[in-house]
Swiss-Prot record:
Gene this protein is translated from: SRR
One Pfam family of this chain: PALP
Identification of the protein by name: Serine racemase
Positions contributing to Mg(2+) 3 binding: 210, 214, 216
E.C. number(s) listed in UniProt: 5.1.1.18, 4.3.1.18, 4.3.1.17
PANTHER family: SERINE / THREONINE RACEMASE FAMILY MEMBER, SERINE RACEMASE
Length: 340
């Protein structure tokens, strides 16, 4: 694997050994209705059943156990990160396992359910403005004040390696998989999965899915250079509002086969479709990948790409806010054959 990348497949293997005793082997489920809609065999990697309700515990726990080894005589005074919710919950849980305080910098606009969960796990919350710049600046200040270690939610190599363990499981659970579809925000999960898949089964496609309102990954691939979102994106998929970064971009640039963008209505309808037809309470961020596979654009993918695994990234749903958009979205034409 190219030396310019921040991690190698060996790092993913180490992460798997590092965390496997403390995480769930999440199931892969299927849906005959969604298969009919797409004309493909869909498999759903259910990270909503993971500890803390999302895939984020994989990277967070690997980071804490890698950056704070037991061999150290003096543990750091804290771990710090910025997060819209899921990474914050995961890092707090991981830090608690290792007996370390956690400080989480959270955008003021983060869903209440995620903020309350972070507090319930025992973290101290510090609020920031909903922009990448504010997140970074406040987190840096808190790290200095607490004499802690910063664990970036998607650019820390140990986090990226931890997220890559998803692909290790998928390739075992679905041996004939032709492609993985992964929602992308900062790109940690996408990069980790891409490194793993291309190391073990280079012929398997890795597709990214992101909201059209937060399409920095798509724009970066299109223009061949890093193109972060200029303004805080407005999307219901709060977990993918971050832009890809310097560590995830080279991997995504070289190893991700294609990127599919989806509208807010497509995300809402796909999320609701999974709720009602699969009985899985996914969050809208997890619905982004489903929306991508159901989109008109995805129909251009070769029919030889038959067996597709979609990573359902999490299930930390703000039920109160969901009431305001359920049933209100205009259903895309591709959904017309299913009554939702």
């Amino acid at each position: 694997m190219c030396a310019q990348y921040c991690i190698s497949f060996a790092d993913v293997e180490k992460a798997h050994i590092n965390i496997r005793d403390s995480i769930h082997l999440t199931p892969v489920l299927t849906s005959s209705i969604l298969n009919q809609l797409t004309g493909r065999n869909l498999f759903f990697k259910c990270e909503l059943f993971q500890k803390t309700g999302s895939f984020k515990i994989r990277g967070a726990l690997n980071a804490v156990r890698s950056l704070v080894p037991d061999a150290l005589e003096r543990k750091p005074k804290a771990v710090v990160t910025h997060s819209s919710g899921n990474h914050g919950q995961a890092l707090t849980y991981a830090a608690k396992l290792e007996g370390i305080p956690a400080y989480i910098v959270v955008p003021q606009t983060a869903p209440d359910c995620k903020k309350l969960a972070i507090q319930a796990y025992g973290a101290s919350i510090v609020y920031c403005e909903p922009s990448d710049e504010s997140r970074e600046n406040v987190a840096k200040r808190v790290t200095e004040e607490t004499e802690g270690i910063m664990v970036h939610p998607n650019q820390e190599p140990a986090v990226i390696a931890g997220q890559g363990t998803i692909a290790l499981e998928v390739l075992n659970q679905v041996p004939l998989v032709d492609a993985l579809v992964v929602p992308v925000g900062g790109g940690g999960m996408l990069a980790g999965i891409a490194i793993t898949v291309k190391a073990l089964k280079p012929s398997v496609k890795v597709y990214a899915a992101e909201p059209s309102n937060a399409d920095d990954c798509y724009q970066s691939k299109l223009k061949g250079k890093l193109m972060p979102n200029l303004y805080p994106p407005e999307t219901i998929a709060d977990g993918v509002k971050s832009s890809i970064g310097l560590n995830t971009w080279p991997i995504i640039r070289d190893l991700v086969d294609d990127i599919f963008t989806v509208t807010e209505d497509e995300i809402k309808c796909a999320t609701q479709l999974v709720w009602e037809r699969m009985k899985l309470l996914i969050e809208p961020t997890a619905g982004v990948g489903v929306a991508a596979v159901l989109s008109q654009h995805f129909q251009t993918v070769s029919p030889e790409v038959k067996n597709i695994c979609i990573v359902l990234s999490g299930g930390n749903v703000d039920l109160t806010s969901s009431i305001t958009w359920v049933k209100q979205a205009e259903r895309p034409a591709s959904y017309q054959s299913v009554s939702v």
